[in-house]
Amino acid sequence: MRLALWTLALVAIAGTPLRAQQVTLGAGYALADYREQADFLHFTGSGPTAMVSVERGRLALRVDAWHLGLDPENNAAPALEPFTLDQLNVRLGVRAMSVVGIEAGYMKRWVDPSRAAQSFSAATLGVRAAYPLAPGAEVAVRTAYVAGTDFTGGGSAPFGIELGLSAYGPGSGRFRVTGDYEFQRIDRRTYQTGGRLSVPIQSSLARVGLTVRF
């Protein structure tokens, strides 16, 4: 339900008239891997994804959303329960050079049931580089620092990083096939009985999809 609402909002944004803009809508399917405390809490799963991007001149706004169903892996701790993960990513980029841009963003993650894993929000700041391979095809790499993380279960994260690799294949007319991989690690820390406990959160997402540009 939450993903459907965000998808409707993305379509509404994309439908707003703006001279000389390029709008891209996309949908896909993703495979995901989620871990807390290394292999102690290990989940895998999959689910649908949606995206919209609006480009105007040197500016680019991109919004991604996904809804994942995650189940415990066999090597995970006992008594773990499956959960759903909804995530929203918003990134605003400015092209600084022909192929390199600077991006600032915000991300929000919801987990249900909340006791199964951490929900959080955070800000991101990074760079993105896109390299054309052929007419209508390109590859892009992205890295970002994750800051200001606010966890529902408490704790802090002095360091977090995102890495991304995307490929856009030549398509037919306005349509293109896409594939991308995202990796995120957040070094969460909590304090118990007077001592500091390291509980890192690590996730990866591989997805394929189809986009249409207007």
Task: List PLM regions with ranges.
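Residues that define the transmembrane beta-barrel architecture of outer-membrane proteins
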Residues: H42-P48, E55-G57, P82-L88, S98, ...
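Outer-membrane beta-barrel channels and translocator barrels
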Residues: E55-L59, R95-V100, P132-G136, P170-S172
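Outer-membrane beta-barrel "beta-signal"
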Residues: L165-P170, P200-F214
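Short glycine/proline- and aromatic-enriched beta-strand/turn motifs that initiate or cap beta-hairpins
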Residues: L18-N75, L88, L205-R207, T211-R213
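Outer-membrane beta-barrel translocator domains and adjoining extracellular loop/strand segments
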Residues: R35-F43, D71-F83, D112-F120, T149-F159, ...
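Transmembrane beta-strands of outer-membrane beta-barrel pores
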Residues: Y29-R35, R56-R58, A65-D71, Y106-D112, ...
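Outer-membrane pore/translocation modules
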Residues: D64-G126
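Transmembrane beta-strands of outer-membrane beta-barrel proteins
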Residues: V23-A27, A50, L59-V63, S98-A104, ...
